[in-house]
């Protein structure tokens, strides 16, 4: 038996699955045949679990059928694990011409791309070590860490999308810093979209546009923040499109971020949006309670403060935000209040320090407001939230509203059930679990949920 069997299995799966599913879950797998065992290696635990639950049975059937065509009645064992094929050597680092020393000079439009000094623009303090991990962002973290280990090999391009303030920029810097830590000679550049556009305009004025394109195409990794800024800028999109193609063809890593899913970015050429979808698109969700607590404690420690657990939970339960910078602002206010008064950090001090912030937040997250916003979003009547109607067009929005009420308010399950037509707390619990399941399996539901949280947090 040989790896040709696995390649044929992949070819069949590629024909049966959507391009996105195949590229996301199966293409990254590495394989190794040893006697009667096919070992499959996934880049991270999340991918491994997804493949095991969704595709493993199909893979086993196809591999066995292919083996039987060559050797009837011969059985094959398939193992799935996290890691790399032991015999696969690490890709050698790209050789950087000696004429290209790393400097802190910005783009100047020199005549030859390989002689253009570059500035990474990376902020060294942003690393994986100080990025607080939780359920809302663990897939994004695992994926970017895998990319840092093998840039250009898997998940290329990577598209991260999230509401502002949820860590997209931090992760871009973290993966760039990790790549440079592994190979200091790598040419890695982080750049905001508006700076890219401005540099391109300057190169046109200076008649150095070809050198500009060559320079970006010569990088080992390009990290572009806020890609939605390119909307409506046709010439910039054309240059980005050419750069994109050149880098992907050369297996050079591209990571992009935006505040919305690629297909939702208006004013972007369809060719570019298609390219964005070639790799993996990952959302970063608003942090859940436990992650908010961890963020608060971490940010307090960075300021030399000891934030008691009960105080951290008190703040986290009342600031169910979609922007981590709000939590950072809360810690700054608490720190200033504690220093000014000389008091210890207690719930009483926090209530005083965050009085205005907590008042605004409480106003935004009432059950009535949630019902109103969800009803408007799904174009149903507010009265449907408490009615006995069970049609999907009504029941699904009602379940989503219940889940939002549990996440965004301090009401108990019985209180939430009462607000939704006197329903039992078990009905609310079922709704929350159902919505959580749907968000994992249905991109439309996931996007709706994120939009609703964003709206309710404004």
Curated annotation (Swiss-Prot):
SMART domains: AAA, Bac_DnaA_C. CDD domains: AAA, Bac_DnaA_C. GO terms for biological process: DNA replication initiation; regulation of DNA replication. ATP binds at residues 165, 167-169. It is found in: Cytoplasm. InterPro entries: AAA+_ATPase (IPR003593), Chromosome_initiator_DnaA (IPR001957), Chromosome_initiator_DnaA-like (IPR020591), Chromosome_initiator_DnaA_CS (IPR018312), DnaA_C (IPR013159), DnaA_dom (IPR013317), DnaA_N_dom (IPR024633), DnaA_N_sf (IPR038454). Residues 79-120 are annotated as: Domain II. PROSITE patterns: DNAA (PS01008). Residues 92-114 are annotated as: Disordered. GO terms for molecular function: ATP binding; ATP hydrolysis activity; DNA replication origin binding; lipid binding. Signal peptide: none annotated. The keyword DNA damage does not apply. Residues 1-79 are annotated as: Domain I, interacts with DnaA modulators. NCBIfam families: DnaA (TIGR00362). PANTHER family: CHROMOSOMAL REPLICATION INITIATOR PROTEIN DNAA. Domain I is involved in oligomerization and binding regulators, domain II is flexibile and of varying length in different bacteria, domain III forms the AAA+ region, while domain IV binds dsDNA. Oligomerizes as a right-handed, spiral filament on DNA at oriC. This is Chromosomal replication initiator protein DnaA. The gene is dnaA.
């Amino acid at each position: 038996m040989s790896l040709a069997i696995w390649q044929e299995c992949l070819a069949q799966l590629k024909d049966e699955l959507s391009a996105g599913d195949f590229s996301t879950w199966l293409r990254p797998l590495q394989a190794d045949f040893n006697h009667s065992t096919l070992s499959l290696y996934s880049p991270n635990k999340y991918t491994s679990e997804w493949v095991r639950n969704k595709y493993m049975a199909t893979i086993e059937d196809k591999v066995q059928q292919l083996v039987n065509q060559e050797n009837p009645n011969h059985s094959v064992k398939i193992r799935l694990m996290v890691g790399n094929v032991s015999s696969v050597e690490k890709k050698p680092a790209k050789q950087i011409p000696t004429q290209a020393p790393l400097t802190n000079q910005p783009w100047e439009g020199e005549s030859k791309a390989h002689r253009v000094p570059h500035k990474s623009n990376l902020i060294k303090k942003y690393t994986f070590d100080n990025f607080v991990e939780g359920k809302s962002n663990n897939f994004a973290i695992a994926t970017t860490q895998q990319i840092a280990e093998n840039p250009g090999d898997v998940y290329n391009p990577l598209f991260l999308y999230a509401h502002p303030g949820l860590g997209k920029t931090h992760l871009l810097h973290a993966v760039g810093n990790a790549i440079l830590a592994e190979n200091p000679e790598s040419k890695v550049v982080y750049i905001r979209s508006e700076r890219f556009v401005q540099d391109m305009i300057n190169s046109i004025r200076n008649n150095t546009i070809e050198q500009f394109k060559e320079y970006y195409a010569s990088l080992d990794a390009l990290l572009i923040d806020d890609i939605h800024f390119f909307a409506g800028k046709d010439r910039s999109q054309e240059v980005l499109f050419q750069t994109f193609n050149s880098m992907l063809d050369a297996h050079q890593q591209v990571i992009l971020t935006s505040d919305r899913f690629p297909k939702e970015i208006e004013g972007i050429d369809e060719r570019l949006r298609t390219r964005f979808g070639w790799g993996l698109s990952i959302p970063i969700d608003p942090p859940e309670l436990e992650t908010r607590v961890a963020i608060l404690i971490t940010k307090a420690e960075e300021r030399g403060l000891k934030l008691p657990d009960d105080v951290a939970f008190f703040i986290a339960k009342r600031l169910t935000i979609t922007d981590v910078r709000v939590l950072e602002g809360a810690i700054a206010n608490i720190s200033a209040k504690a220093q000014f008064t000389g008091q210890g950090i207690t719930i009483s001090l926090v209530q005083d320090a965050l009085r205005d912030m907590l008042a605004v937040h409480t106003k935004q997250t009432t059950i009535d407001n949630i019902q109103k916003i969800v009803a408007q979003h799904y174009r149903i009547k507010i009265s449907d939230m408490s009615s006995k109607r069970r049609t999907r067009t009504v029941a699904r929005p009602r379940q989503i509203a219940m889940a939002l009420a549990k996440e965004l308010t301090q009401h108990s399950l019985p209180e939430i059930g009462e607000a939704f037509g006197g329903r039992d707390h078990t009905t609310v619990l079922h709704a929350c679990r159902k919505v959580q399941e749907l968000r994992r399996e249905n991109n439309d539901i996931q996007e709706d949920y994120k939009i609703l949280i964003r709206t309710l947090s404004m």
